[in-house]
Amino acid sequence: MQTHEIRQRFTDHFVKSGHTEVPSASLILDDPNLLFVNAGMVPFKPYFLGQETPPFGTATSIQKCVRTLDIDEVGITTRHNTFFQMAGNFSFGQYFKEGAIKNAWTLLTNSVDDGGLGLNPDRLWVTVYEDDDEAAQLWHDLVGLPTERIQRLGMEDNYWHMGVPGPCGPCSEIYYDRGPAYGEDGGPAVDDSRFIEIWNLVFMEFERGETKPDGSFDIVGNLPKKNIDTGMGVERLAFLLQGVDNVYETDLLRPVIDTAEKLTGTRYGTQDKDDIRFRVIADHSRTALMLILDGVTPGNEGRGYILRRLIRRIIRSARLLGAQGAVIEQLLGTVREAMTPSYPEIEENWERIRSVGVTEEKAFLKTLESGSQLFEQFLTEARNSGTSVVPGAVAFSLHDTHGFPIDLTREMAEEASLTVDEAGFHELMAEQKARAKADSAAKKHVHADLSVYRAFIDSHPTHFTGYENTADEGKVLGLIVDGQLADRASAGQHAQVILDQTPFYAESGGQMADRGSLRGPGGLAKVVDVQKIAKKVWAHLIEVTEGELAIGELLEARVDQKWRHQARQAHSGTHLIHAALREVLGPTAVQAGSMNKPGYLRFDFSYGDQLTEKQLQQIEEIANSAVDTDYQVNTIETSLEEAKAMGAMALFGENYGKQVRVVEIGGPFSMELCGGIHVDHSSQIGPISVLGESSVGSGVRRIEAYTGMDSFRHLAADRSLVANLAANFKATSEEIPERIDALTAKLKAAEKQVQQLRAQQLAAQVGSIVDSAADVSGVKVLTQNLGEGLGAKELRSVAQDAIARFNSETAVVLFTSQDGEKVPFVAAANPQAVERGLKAGDLVKAFGAEVGGRGGGKPALAQGSGSDASGVDAGLAAVQRLVNEILS
């Protein structure tokens, strides 16, 4: 039975029994504590916690999930997958244990002709919580399961809770017996290789208290309603129903392994270490595609780092299996074919998915080549010196300079029977992060614990009136000073104010929050920011400038209209830029993020290549043409399904409610799901000036622009610059490019002439320089600062010339210079010196350590660059010391 059919039978079974079918949520939820959705119940969590009222009594879903905690175990065993699908049925006070058990048993054991999955009931076992007599009795009486196939296990195995005070309850797990070929008899309590868990039924009926020092907790009460949460692993059931040994042999993953065989020329099933790599490729390819589908792009932090790590593990595994060229497009293409029947949205987003994957592969292949050279160089040194540990500094250099994740360095080290000084690596990483933190202002945010807002979230959500008004009255429901609830806030204090209603827009959707003022009967405050808490409460960050504000007062909330107007211009301008981008670049240019503040916009989008100047001009012209056309801007409140049917664009990875807001500019020109504040007509945006574009990550570009008066001022500054250039060149504005080209050509010719003269001068001096070499234990040692203005190329030429002049004498040289802010340096050693242990690479490292740089190369010739010219003398002395130590 194909996986898609298993999914369909599951859904049909529960829909027929009255459950509401709920589509899978995105893998990315608006939860800072959750990297990815990792369980089927996660999207229903607010209902189970009582934070929201479910719009249905029972539901069923097949949820996309990603778990990356055991990413290093993938492939080593056949059990671990980073991406999986969790089929579940949920009841919110409608049915309990009897309904859950009956539903599961019926679907699993009914014949295929009757809509079931056709499992042999004689092969099914269950476990229940050791004290759950009711569940054990139901399994026996309701479905006829023999008592010997009902096993009781303890709290660790069969009791569900979230690790914190809240709902909890016993659970019951269903297992399938694969037969004696897979292990000994005795049920799941004895052998979890033979007995495979396929379904977990959680009976939520109690509320637990705080965790005690010994790890236990008390049951403090019953839940108002008894709930059901179940989860069935689709992939596990698929390999059982398809008659194969594990998930990697199913219709979802085996085709990816087949493609990998063709790409690498290696056969699966011949060597264990190769099989591990094949499974890594299959698992990670599927997960990477599903993450990109939901809007994740490769990066160096968080979700982006996970995706980057997966793609890089795919590429390296493929190369270790023998792949020579690119592999990502073909691997993702195979995943596309396997997954599209269940996720048709893959097809419409394929070009974007392909582009992100291929772009990351190109970048990593360059990284892999340069980083591998450095690692191989260290391996040679390690073998010579007998060390078994990769120093933290080497791992940090691979990460910082070549983009090697620490796990990749660890894998490469393990393959060479080495370990990595990860403590040293993390210490250097921490130092780097501390420096970065000191150099940048901390992002402002609401600095109170979320519990402070709990009462307002549950009972007093803020009513936003800002779509219609820029001024309104609001009652003070809460004041927070220094992270604690307070009765009042006085002049000079910074605080947060929660009102029952407000015209202030809270930062969201890329749009900065409004600024303005709050005035009460006894005080005045400046609003410096507004943050949305749990999507329900507006926290106004204020500075009290006069008197005081107090709980219960009625305040006049007034938005700074100039700020609001310019923010609206920027946000509407972003929509025009987005539409223009898609017109010029095609539908693969999909939004990856944005930021709008008064007069300025920044728009990130998925695209693999740098934009040309011509493309930027086209985008700017299309956007300004839309401004000139004076399109009407309409907002429409509608259902998510209707919005999609209208053609409204949604942000990938964003989770929308059933009701959404559509912003339409000029009918078909631009239509997006958006909760921001916009102009009424496109002409109100004013001129849009595109500043340029840049890369912000693998496969992600950023375009920046000014709007309104900021755009006008930018254009005026450009005009003034052109006028000054024209005056200096005594030319018209049209002639300036030609004059600059001519001047540049003259400058390059002069620089070339200077370099030639300098090279001739140095060549004439090499003889006298060589004569100044010192003799150390029969070795000619020459270290010298050759002054300013020499680059690596010139230093290399002098070093090679000098070393040649020593003829049969053993000799090493190191030369340095100051080239602007850089300190280039080159070392050379002739064969006789290398034989005595004097290697150019070692000299370069010793010198580089003193000038804030690093370098590398071969034993005969190496070079590097530093940034601290004050350390040149110390560097030359360090080289002398190293030579003395080696020769002593």
Swiss-Prot record:
Offer an example of a GO molecular function term for this protein: alanine-tRNA ligase activity
GO cellular component annotations of the record: cytosol
Top-level taxon in the UniProt lineage: Bacteria
The top EC class, named as a word, is ligase
The subcellular localization recorded is: Cytoplasm
Q: Which residues bind Zn(2+)?
A: 571, 575, 674, 678
Supply the EC number(s): 6.1.1.7
Required cofactor names: Zn(2+)
The record's section on SUPFAM superfamilies has: Class II aaRS and biotin synthetases, Putative anticodon-binding domain of alanyl-tRNA synthetase (AlaRS), ThrRS/AlaRS common domain, Translation proteins
Q: Which HAMAP family match?
A: Ala_tRNA_synth_B
Tell me the domain comment.
Consists of three domains; the N-terminal catalytic domain, the editing domain and the C-terminal C-Ala domain. The editing domain removes incorrectly charged amino acids, while the C-Ala domain, along with tRNA(Ala), serves as a bridge to cooperatively bring together the editing and aminoacylation centers thus stimulating deacylation of misacylated tRNAs.
Q: Which family does it belong to?
A: Belongs to the class-II aminoacyl-tRNA synthetase family.
Instruction: Give the function comment from the record.
Output: Catalyzes the attachment of alanine to tRNA(Ala) in a two-step reaction: alanine is first activated by ATP to form Ala-AMP and then transferred to the acceptor end of tRNA(Ala). Also edits incorrectly charged Ser-tRNA(Ala) and Gly-tRNA(Ala) via its editing domain.
Protein's recorded name = Alanine--tRNA ligase
From what organism does this protein derive? Corynebacterium urealyticum (strain ATCC 43042 / DSM 7109)
